[in-house]
Amino acid sequence: MSNNVVVLGTQWGDEGKGKVVDILTERAKYVIRYQGGHNAGHTLVINGEKTILHLIPSGILRENVKSIIAHGVVLSPEALIKEIHELEARGIPVRQRMLISEACPLLLSYHVAMDIAREKARGTNALGTTGRGIGPAYEDKVARRALRVSDLFNKESFAIKLKDIVDYYNFQLVHYYKVEAVSYQKILNDIMVVTDMLTSMVADISVLLYNAYQQGDIMMFEGAQGTLLDIDHGTYPYVTSSNTTAGCVTTGSGLGPHYIGYVLGIVKAYSTRVGAGPFPTELFDDTGNFLCLKGHEFGATTGRRRRTGWLDAVALRRAVHINSISGLCLTKLDVLDGLKEIKICSAYRMQDGCIIYTTPIALEKWEGIEPIYETLPGWNETTVGIQALADLPRAAHQYIKLIEELTRVPVDIISTGPDRRDTIILHDPFSD
């Protein structure tokens, strides 16, 4: 069995994956982003200094780690170059540490324009996208009209292909959505400025990863968003446009499933969601406000305030099953400090009174769901910075045990603060 590890979110994103990946990359040779785009926001805090990454893998801060953007990612050249310059200004040699798949679809300004136009046209039925163009970029990939990084090697051919697709988008933008057209010449000029930088980092990622496996190098696969936002398994249509589950690791990176050994599911000690969509355990009271403010629940990408609620073990069980999760990492446990009681949703009561223990599929069936809670005592002691399980309050132990019982999966890692050091590792994911 391989000891390569997948790290992914089990909720609606924002679970704290970036910090966990950063910790575990101390053991890895490669960190791979395999899906999503710059709609992700992974926050790392190292010695009190905050770093927010959107496209670049969280392993970039490690000197001996190679960061990979694989072909399952839709790549915004503008966002990537901006991120590279910001990190290099801090002395991090990004271009020496990172490689990009030449099969990555390019995300350009016409995708953003279409995303924004569609959301505006939906009015009160807006999906709550980040407006970064992710959906339209994936649409182009599926429709086989996407421009890819590999197209940049032939600038003349790229310019012709770009003209065709800009005309296609502008027809819709102007005649259907009644908004301004995007400028073909500006898009072409902007991409030509950064073409040489992008192509200098290109590699055949599938071959690279297979060779790394043959050499015994350890790999970490970093997911973006969360399971409940998966295009197939999430709360459709309030989902992202990629597969966020473990199955996408192989299709999005080009490394076969036999070479994956352990799947670590990141779960926040409470639930959050950005944008519209079902959220059975959402809190609208002082407790919800407490979790939002204490947990600093504002999007790293959009700055939007996140909706907050109690931990939903029903949805978490679904994530465990879909991803064949080996172990859980419980994050932001310290945010619960000071609450008199803590609740976990263990089942749903449907509108007809029926009790179910797994999430529904159809959107209509989410309506009117009543969460059924298990209530536990809270704790007044601080858990911030605790690094040993024995030092946690007794009530925190009870909370962790109930999560394990409801999901039938062990909690292998506990995060007690934003810094690397604020972590309890009960089981090493690389030891399997």
Swiss-Prot record:
Binding site residues for GTP: 13-19, 41-43, 306, 332-334, 415-417
GO biological process: 'de novo' AMP biosynthetic process; IMP metabolic process
PROSITE patterns: ADENYLOSUCCIN_SYN_1 (PS01266), ADENYLOSUCCIN_SYN_2 (PS00513)
UniProt-annotated binding residues for IMP: 14-17, 39-42, 130, 144, 225, 240, 304
Listed name of the protein: Adenylosuccinate synthetase
Principal place of residence: cytoplasm
Xref: NCBIfam families: PRK01117.1 (NF002223), purA (TIGR00184)
Name of the gene this protein is made from: purA
Pfam families hit by this protein: Adenylsucc_synt
Organism taxonomic ancestry: Bacteria, Pseudomonadati, Pseudomonadota, Gammaproteobacteria, Candidatus Palibaumannia
